[in-house]
Amino acid sequence: FLGIRPNEKNRVNTGRETFILPVDWSGTFPVFENGLIPMKPTLKMPSGVENQTGKNGYLPSGNFVFKDDFSDKTLDLRWIGLRGPREDFVDMTDKGLRIIPFTSNINEVKPTSTLFYRQQHNQFTAAATMEYKPKNEKDFAGITCYQNERYHYVFGITKKGKDYYLILQRTEKGQASVLGEVKIETEKPVTLQVTANGDDYRFNYSIDGKGFLNLGGTVSGDILSTNEAGGFTGAMIGLYATSVGY
C-alpha cells in the first residue's frame, strides 16, 4: 500500500512511498497489522525470510551511505535524469563526472542538465566536490534541492564581472530570491553540502576540504514538500549546471 512519512511540521518531502505490512483476512474485511494502533516503522522479518537489504546487489534501506566517485564507465541506476536521458549531458572522465550544460535551466519545463538522487530521509547530508570556473554571468554549476520547476533551491557558483560568487537562491511559486552570496576562489575544488534535519535545511561549503562554512543560515524545506509544491513524487537532490542563468 502507499503511505507517507511526514516531518515534525507534518510536511512530506520524501513523497509517496510503498509500505508492506502483514494483513489478517480471517474476518469479513482485511485488517492490517495492529489495526488502528500506532506501530513502529519496522517489523520483524517473517520466519524463513532473509533480509538482504543492501546485500548481493539489492539497494539499501534505513540509514546508509551512498558514495559515488564516478569512476565506473556507466552511471549508477540511482541517478535520475529529468525529461530526457542522463547520458545526453554527462561525460565520464578520468577525474570524475563532467556535466555538459544545456541551454535551459531548472525553471523551465524542458530537459535539464541535472543529475538527481531522490531524497529518502528526513535527516540527511549530501555533498559534492567540483572543479568549476564559469566563463560568464550566465554560467552556473552546483547542487539543487528540487521539487519542481517552480519550487526549489539552487546552490552553486557563477560569475559577476571579474569575480566568482557562490549563490544560494530559493524559488517559490516561480519567484526567485537570493538568500545569500559570497565571493569565492575557484582555483581549487569546492565542496558543496546540504544537510536536512526535518524541515530545517542548511547549505554549506568548504574551500579546503576540511571545515564547512554556512551560507544563508537555516532555511525551510517547505517548498520541497508535496504540501506546498503539490504532486506526490517527493524532493530530489541534484548535480546541476546551466549556461543560460540559474
Model-derived regions, located:
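Carbohydrate-active catalytic/glycan-binding domains of CAZyme proteins
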Residues: F1-Y246
